[in-house]
Regions:
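N-terminal secretory signal peptides that target proteins for export/translocation
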Residues: 1-2
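Phosphate-group recognition and catalysis centered on beta-loop-alpha active-site segments
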Residues: 5-9, 15-274
C-alpha cells in the first residue's frame, strides 16, 4: 500500500487537523478562481488570470487540451464553438490556428482575448507567485491525448512551477499516469455528484489513499461535514467545485473546506474576510 503523498501539503499550506487553523480552530479555506473567474471575465483567458491574481486568488484554475501540432492549450471544451469564434475540435487545429481565434465572453460576444498556451498561463502564475489547479481534459471523442502528461510536466519544470501546481483529472488513467511520472507531484482526483451516485465516497477515498493521492475535488453539492471528516481521516484534502451561490460558499467556508473553487472569486473573497 502506498502512503499518501505529502508533496502537496506545503503547496496548500493547510492544516487538516481541527484546532490548527484559524481562531475558530478550523482549517484555512483557500480561494481558487475557476477558469480565472468565468462569471467575471472571458473564461480561461489571460485577462481573467491576471485579474484573478490581482484580486488575490490563491489559485488560478484552468483546463488543458492538445493542439494538432502538440502544443498544450488552455481551454475548457474539447471543441471551439462555445468559447471562441472558431469551429471544430481543439485537437484538429494547430497552435497558430488556435491563436488566430478570439475568445467570447459569457454573453457570447467576441473579445480581443486569444486562446492561451499553457506556457503563457504558467508565466502569469509564476511571475505573480500564485499557485495553479490544472485540469487535464479528454478530447472530443472522450479519449486521452497521447503524451499530454509528459508535455504538462515539461512545461511545469521549465518554469519551476511543479511544486506550485495541483494536476487534476476526472479520468483515473490520467492522474495515475501523473503519479507514475512524478510521484512527488500533487495530483487531485475529481468526482461529480453523478459519479459518486455509482459508488461511495468512503470507497473512493480508500482507493485514493492507497494510490497516494492527497487531494480530491468534489462537486460542492456532496460536500458536507461528514464528507470532510471522512477525507481528513484518510489524510486527503478537499476542494469543492464550482461554488457560485453565496450561501453555499458560506456553508463550505464554515465547514472548513480546503479549497473553494468558484467563478466568482470576488464574492468568495468578501466572504473569506480578505
Amino acid at each position: 500500500m502506498r502512503s499518501v503523498s505529502i508533496a502537496g501539503w506545503a503547496l496548500f499550506g493547510l492544516a487538516i487537523v481541527a484546532g490548527s487553523g484559524g481562531a475558530q480552530g478550523k482549517p484555512t479555506t483557500l480561494l481558487a478562481a475557476h477558469r480565472g473567474g468565468a462569471l467575471l471575465w472571458p473564461e480561461n483567458s489571460l485577462l481573467a488570470f491576471r485579474n484573478a491574481v490581482a484580486l488575490g486568488a490563491d489559485f488560478i484554475e484552468f483546463d488543458v487540451h492538445l493542439s494538432r501540432d502538440g502544443e498544450v492549450m488552455v481551454i475548457h471544451d474539447p471543441t471551439l464553438e462555445r468559447t471562441t469564434n472558431g469551429q471544430g475540435a481543439v485537437r484538429d487545429r494547430t497552435v497558430a490556428e488556435l491563436k488566430a481565434l478570439r475568445l467570447k465572453d459569457r454573453a457570447g460576444v467576441v473579445t480581443g482575448e486569444t486562446v492561451p498556451t499553457l506556457d503563457e498561463v504558467i508565466a502569469v502564475a509564476s511571475q505573480a507567485g500564485r499557485r495553479m489547479l490544472l485540469e487535464i481534459k479528454l478530447d472530443a471523442g472522450r479519449a486521452r491525448y497521447p503524451g499530454i502528461e509528459e508535455k504538462v510536466l515539461a512545461l511545469l519544470d521549465r518554469h519551476r512551477m511543479a511544486g506550485s501546481t495541483v494536476v487534476m483529472a476526472f479520468e483515473p488513467a490520467t492522474w495515475k499516469r501523473m503519479r507514475e511520472l512524478r510521484p512527488d507531484l500533487a495530483v487531485c482526483a475529481l468526482y461529480s455528484a453523478r459519479m459518486l451516485g455509482r459508488t461511495t465516497l468512503a470507497a473512493e477515498l480508500e482507493t485514493l489513499r492507497a494510490a497516494g493521492v492527497g487531494f480530491v475535488g468534489l462537486e460542492h453539492t456532496v460536500v458536507d461535514m461528514g464528507a470532510l471528516a471522512q477525507a481528513r481521516q484518510a489524510g486527503i484534502q478537499v476542494g469543492a467545485w464550482t461554488v457560485n451561490d453565496a450561501a453555499a460558499m458560506k456553508r463550505l467556508i464554515e465547514a472548513g473546506v480546503g479549497v473553494l473553487i468558484t467563478d466568482q472569486p470576488d464574492v468568495a473573497k468578501a466572504l473569506l474576510g480578505r
